């Protein structure tokens, strides 16, 4: 069962492995009991000519049925990369990685940030001073450098990126939650809850946090966009998602040299995709800010 689960995970983030041997050809013809093909060559010269006997094609009982069963014509809307892989397919698989990084990183940052911010804002005093010191130290380190340091410490890999990005984004959440909690805990209903003898955990989780979530939702949308951008940067540097797992940043890394070699679309298309996705989540954050009317 564990092996099947791992296979499903690999298929989701890497794509389904093609077990068939595919040979690109530019021409073919049937000659006697042979299938004669001309292999595709992108250098403007004729490719190698090869003959395949009918005995190799076990699905076809007649050599004339081989083209129908074994030869297919494929179109690549965005072309292929330098390894002959469909760029559109890799882009579609790559968006799964970007969205997964965003969701998991934001989830990790919310868990840590809400917990630390709520504790600091509610208890105050030395507890607040210690937590704010940790927040300020973390805040002073450039985000990308901190992510790179954590990634190098944990090792290259997909899950390491989740943890590294999540551990660098909690400080913003913590500062916002702390400010909200310090304001909300002065409300009369919180004082009433204390008078009724409710414990601190219940007061924080049932009365304070539910009334402090509007700004957190907005910052989460912004953090989602930032996580996608950071992951793309890590993959471009070679310390993010590792091959053969397709990542938009990794696709740019593999093909940025083609910008001056006549095929700039190989790097421009994933770059535009990153820009569009990040912009979309920033617009979502702005819309949430207006809808939730945080300022009022």
Each language-model region and where it sits:
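Alpha-helical transmembrane segments of integral membrane proteins
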Residues: 80-296
């Amino acid at each position: 069962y564990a092996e099947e689960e791992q296979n499903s995970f690999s298929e989701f983030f890497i794509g389904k492995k093609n077990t068939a041997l595919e040979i690109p050809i530019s021409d073919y013809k049937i000659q006697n009991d042979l299938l004669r093909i001309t292999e595709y060559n992108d250098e403007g010269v004729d490719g190698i000519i090869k003959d395949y006997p009918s005995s190799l094609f076990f699905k076809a009982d007649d050599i004339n049925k081989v083209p129908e069963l074994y030869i297919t014509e494929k179109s690549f809307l965005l072309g292929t990369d330098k390894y002959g892989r469909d760029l559109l397919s890799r882009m579609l698989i790559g968006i799964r990685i970007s969205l997964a990084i965003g969701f998991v990183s934001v989830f990790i940052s919310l868990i840590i940030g809400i917990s630390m911010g709520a504790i600091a804002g509610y208890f105050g005093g030395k507890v607040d001073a210690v937590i704010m010191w940790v927040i300020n130290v973390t805040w002073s380190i450039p985000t990308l450098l901190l992510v790179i340091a954590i990634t190098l410490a944990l090792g290259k890999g997909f899950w390491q990126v989740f943890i590294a990005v999540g551990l660098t984004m909690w400080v913003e959440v913590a500062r916002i939650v702390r400010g909200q909690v310090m304001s909300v805990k002065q409300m009369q209903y919180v004082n009433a809850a204390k008078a009724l003898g409710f414990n601190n955990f219940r007061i924080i989780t049932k009365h304070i946090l539910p009334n402090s979530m509007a700004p957190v939702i907005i910052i989460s949308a912004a953090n989602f966009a930032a996580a996608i951008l950071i992951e793309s940067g890590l993959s471009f540097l070679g310390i993010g998602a590792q091959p053969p797992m397709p990542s938009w940043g990794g696709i740019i890394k593999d093909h940025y040299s083609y910008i001056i070699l006549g095929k700039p679309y190989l790097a421009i298309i994933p770059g535009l995709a990153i820009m569009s996705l990040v912009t979309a989540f920033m617009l979502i954050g702005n819309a949430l800010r207006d809808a939730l009317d945080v300022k009022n």
